[in-house]
C-alpha cells in the first residue's frame, strides 16, 4: 500500500504452454490497485491480434498497458535485439536509469528497418500469420490423433505433454 510504484508484469503468451494472458483481467486488476502494467509480448508480436500487434491488441487493451517489451528475433526476423514501448515519461526514466540500456549498443539501422518493414507487411496482409496458425492447428490435430496430450491454444506454441521428465529428456 505504501509503495511509490506498483507493477504487474506478465507474458502476453506464456512460452511453455502457449496460453494467452487475460490482459483485460490484468489491466482491470491494475486499475483497481493503482498499478502499472508491463507485458512481455515476445511470443505474440507479429502473430497475435488483428494486425499482429500482440496480445494487447487481441485483448482490446491497447493503451491500458504501460510498458510493452518484445523481441525482433521471432516473427520480425531481425535475429537480434528487442524493444520496449510505453508512455514517454516511463521510457525517459528507463533511458536514464536502466543499466542494461546504458551499457548496451544501439541496433544496426538495417535490422530496425527490416523489422519495421515486416511490421508493415504483416499489418497489411494476414496471410503469413494465418498460415502459421493453420500449421499450428494442423500439428495439434495430428498429434492428438496419434494419442498425444496436446492442449488447445490460441497461439502458435504447441506443447507436447509427456508427463515423464526422463522421457522428455531423451
What is each model feature region?
Residues 130-139, 145-170:
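Conserved PLP-binding catalytic core of the aspartate aminotransferase-like
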Residues 6, 104-105, 149-154:
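Short beta-strand
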Residues 1-39:
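Active-site phosphate-binding strand-loop segment of PLP-dependent enzymes
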Residues 80-81, 98-107:
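A short glycine-threonine-serine/GTX helix/turn-capping micro-motif
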Residues 110-130, 141-145, 164:
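Amphipathic alpha-helix from the class-I
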Residues 51, 57-93:
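Active-site PLP attachment segment
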Residues 13-17, 44-47, 101-102, 159-160:
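Short, small-residue-enriched loops and turns at beta-alpha junctions
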